[in-house]
Amino acid sequence: MTLVEVVISLAITGLTVAGIVTGYIFCLTTTVKDGLYMAANASALARLEETRSAIWAPDRAEPLDQLTAANFPDKVVTLDKSGDGSVITSATVRTDIAQLSLSPPVRRIRVDCIWKFKGVELVTNSIETCRAPDQ
């Protein structure tokens, strides 16, 4: 074996190891981001269920309307916490309720869960639905 062959084989080995390490880091980052996506989606769904359980009964003898944006202020939730508790990923859950139609009465409910990935990339998970009274 000559020195040139040894240098070329070391270069190929170095590139292979670098590719494996880069692939591992990419997979790890993607897995962490996916876990945060799922946690944010669960937080948005939880707030959507809160709005679904609010009473909206305009046809009662005494009309009752708890389905207003004022009853669902912005809420800060924890999506993830490191093992020692030093790194916390938090999100803000924002609820928007708008009247779509008066006859028949229908409201649009939109829930946004806004969070930052690694403190840099701003990500928003959104869920939107429509609701009629007494549902």
Residue ranges of predicted features:
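Low-complexity, Gly/Pro-rich coil/beta segments used as flexible assembly/activation regions
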Residues: G35-Q135
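Aliphatic-rich helix starts adjacent to a transmembrane/signal segment
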Residues: M1-L45
